[in-house]
Amino acid sequence: MGSLSYPLSDPVYIDANILIYTVERVQPHMDALRGFWRWTNAQGLVVLTSELTVLESLVGPLKANNRRLEARFRRLLYQSANLRLIPVSRSVLERAAQLRAHTPALKTPDAIHAATALEAGAATFITNDAQFQQVSGLMVVAPRDLPTI
C-alpha cells in the first residue's frame, strides 16, 4: 500500500468507483482515500470526474431507496469545493468512440471516463479498474497505491 507519494500530478481525475468507495466508506480502500481527500483539501486542488459519475453513483442508493446514502452522494457530487463534474460533451463522446474502437476491453462507460480525463488534461487517473491501464496517455493509479497520510 502507498507505493506513490504526494504530490500527484495535477489535475487528478477519479473514476466513479473512487467516489462510491469514498461515500460508502469501502475497505480496504478507505484509509488511502481518506488521505487522498485530505491532501486535495489541504492543497486546494480540484478533482475531476465525468457527469456520468452522477448516474453511476446514484443508482445503488436509489435502487435501495436509501435516502440517507443518496443525500451523502449528492452532497459530495454537488457541494464539494474541490470536486468538478465535467460534462459529457460531443468531443468526449467522439474520443470515447475512438477508445472503444481500439480498446475492446473498455466498456462504454469506462471509455467515457477515459475520454473525459484525456480531454480535461488529467495527469493522474485514480481507479480500481485495471482495464484503464490499456489507455494510452493515462497515468493510472489504484487506491492501494495511494500514499496514506
Spans of model-derived segments:
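Acidic catalytic patch
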Residues: R25, L52-T53, S80-T103
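Short active-site oxyanion
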Residues: A42-V47, N82-R84, G121-T124
